[in-house]
């Protein structure tokens, strides 16, 4: 596992990143500056910064930041301004918007149609070239810059007057894993670890080696299918940040209350729940986890054990990882004397050995320092959407037997 190559300085790492991942990296302090005033997902913001600010020249960076601000101000669609933008589109005949676009095939008339999330438009005709070229449009949708035309035709009252002239994704439309692996080879293991940590906004130079690996372990549910992960620790250590802000493929269930229909399967609508729609379902504040259904926790245990669950007459399978994060308000020593390390869980989960057996990894959150300004990086890292997409691609590769090369597990482990 060790890499004997000589470690490079920050400048060397930056040069290697620019050479091998140009357009896919961004200076993280720029994200912080613009994010404060822009109500737009981090991964969209960083994609734009990666396009216009991937340089060491301060003038180029300044011009790029101004361009990104202008693009967001002029084109980003806020849901409460949807009608105003449609009116501008009608008056001028054309307008460019930034919105989340989902495309589906209408099999009745053999054509593709696009839905706009914030703009509220449904079934807008879209050329076949876009879903063919950008398959993520068909798999849950991606954020795009879209040039729209408005042309009302008296004879075609049933159709929509809105047409898509051009569509450009502002998320990674596709990630080439082979290209990533080729680029990875020019970095040592330590350098690559630092790059990954900077990509999620952390500064590795102020962390110990163990703290680095603990932070990296938070990414496990995003790269492994059906991985059950638990982290309990003090406040202000960023336990839920990764699942809420960094990856567009994970969802954070705040407050803890949920239903079997919402999480697993809705019998009335015949639709799959969160575990079928997301790569990772994270529960914030485990102390508040409650199911309105009596059989909720039992169904969750079945899913955590096998990756499937029974609803009605059929069994459904899904690949989402389950993450449980929560706060420990006492010291660990006191907790171990008075109860257990699973004390923050509701009793029906924290004292159920069948549930605890299904947890693959318990991350000791008390070993991660409380975050201060110096813990956040101003250096280069991958744009979050690129990081999230290559983590999603890694879910397709199996590493379940990798541990056998280094360890032999006893028979008493299940």
List each model region and its residues.
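Phosphate-sensing "switch" segment of ASCE/P-loop ATPases
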Residues: 315-322, 327-414
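Conserved ASCE/P-loop NTPase catalytic core
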Residues: 203-334, 339-343, 357
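Conserved phosphate/pyrophosphate-binding and hydrolysis machinery centered on Walker-type P-loop NTPases
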Residues: 182, 186, 208-212, 377-380, ...
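Helical mechanochemical/support elements of P-loop NTPase systems and associated helical scaffolds
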Residues: 188, 192, 292, 296, ...
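Extended, charged/polar low-complexity intrinsically disordered regions
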Residues: 2-199
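Intrinsically disordered, low-complexity boundary segments flanking structured domains
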Residues: 129-134, 239, 345-352
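Hydrophobic, Leu/Ile/Phe/Ala-enriched alpha-helical segments that form helix-helix packing faces
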Residues: 196, 200, 303-307, 390-395
């Amino acid at each position: 596992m060790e890499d004997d190559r000589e470690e490079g300085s920050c400048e060397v790492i930056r040069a290697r990143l620019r050479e091998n991942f140009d357009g896919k990296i961004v200076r993280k302090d720029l994200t912080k500056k613009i994010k404060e005033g822009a109500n737009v997902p981090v991964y969209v913001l960083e994609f734009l910064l990666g396009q216009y600010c991937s340089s060491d020249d301060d003038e180029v960076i300044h011009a790029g930041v101004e361009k990104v601000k202008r693009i967001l101000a002029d084109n980003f669609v806020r849901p409460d301004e949807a009608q105003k933008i449609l009116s501008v589109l009608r008056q001028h005949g054309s307008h460019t918007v930034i919105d989340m676009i989902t495309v589906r095939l209408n099999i009745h008339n053999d054509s593709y149609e696009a839905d706009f999330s914030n703009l509220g438009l449904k079934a807008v005709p879209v050329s076949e070239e876009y879903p063919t070229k950008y398959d993520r449009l068909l798999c849950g949708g991606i954020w795009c810059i879209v040039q729209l035309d408005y042309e009302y035709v008296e004879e075609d009252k049933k159709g929509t007057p809105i047409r898509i002239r051009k569509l450009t994704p502002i998320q990674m439309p596709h990630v080439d894993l082979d290209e990533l692996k080729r680029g990875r080879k020019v970095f040592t293991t330590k350098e690559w670890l630092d790059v990954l940590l900077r990509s999620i906004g952390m500064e590795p130079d102020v962390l110990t080696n163990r703290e680095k690996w603990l932070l990296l372990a938070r990414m496990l549910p995003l790269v492994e299918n059906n991985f059950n992960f638990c982290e309990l620790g003090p406040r202000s250590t960023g336990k839920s940040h990764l699942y809420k802000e960094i990856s567009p493929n994970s969802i954070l269930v705040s407050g803890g209350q949920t239903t079997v229909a919402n999480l697993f399967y809705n019998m009335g609508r015949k639709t799959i729940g969160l575990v079928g729609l997301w790569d990772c379902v994270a529960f914030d504040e485990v102390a508040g986890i409650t199911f309105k259904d009596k059989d909720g926790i039992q169904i969750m245990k079945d899913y955590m054990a096998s990756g499937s669950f029974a609803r009605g007459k059929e069994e459904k399978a899904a690949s989402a990882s389950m993450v449980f994060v929560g706060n420990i308000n006492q010291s660990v020593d006191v907790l171990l004397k008075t109860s257990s390390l699973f004390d923050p869980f509701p009793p029906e989960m924290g004292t159920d050995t069948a549930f605890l057996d299904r947890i693959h990894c318990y991350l000791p959150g008390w070993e991660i320092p409380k975050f201060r300004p110096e813990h956040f990086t101003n250096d280069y890292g991958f744009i979050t959407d690129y990081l999230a997409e290559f983590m999603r691609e890694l879910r397709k590769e199996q590493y379940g037997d990798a541990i056998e090369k280094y360890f032999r597990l006893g028979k008493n482990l299940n």
